[in-house]
Curated annotation (Swiss-Prot):
Keywords: Cell junction, Cell membrane, Membrane, Transmembrane, Transmembrane helix. It comes from Drosophila melanogaster (Fruit fly). The lineage of its organism: Eukaryota, Metazoa, Ecdysozoa, Arthropoda, Hexapoda. It is a multi-pass membrane protein. Residues 28-53, 110-128 are extracellular. This is Protein snakeskin. GO terms for cellular component: apicolateral plasma membrane; plasma membrane; smooth septate junction. Forms a complex with Tsp2A and mesh. Interacts with mesh; the interaction may be necessary for the localization of both proteins to the cell apicolateral region.
Amino acid sequence: MVSVETVGSIFIKALKLIINLVIIFLYRWGDGGEFLGIGGTWNLNEEKSADAEIVASGVMVGFLIYTGCHTIAFAFGTTKHKGELCDTIMNVVGCIMWIAVGGVALHYWKGYMSDEGFLYVNSERQVGIAMGSLCVIEGALYLLDTVLACIHYSKGDTDYTQ
């Protein structure tokens, strides 16, 4: 029989994939069809930090691939991979990285002012704040998935505990 933790984990992984895709679309086309980006620094020209953009795009694409592969593995119905320590470690890393990327985005876009007449409220800023908020929510989902992975691991269904 399928456990509640397994169903919850599959649901959370599907939700993580959907939110991850939304974040990638906002990141790439969030500025009226142009590149929005994470931001990451204020300077004289209001240019975005290349370092923050590289890390953010790596987190977004990397965890999309990892979560997609892991969700497909869940669909095969075997119980061996559910209690692997690797899943727990990747969820902890995902939680930290998503919250860090979301924090950088929120920090940048909260203080962002448009070039057009010093407008404090504009669509680019609002989309940036929404993207940062979704990144923090994604980090919270990875934390919740970490808890479920720890429950799977503690149940002792793997060869490691025998």
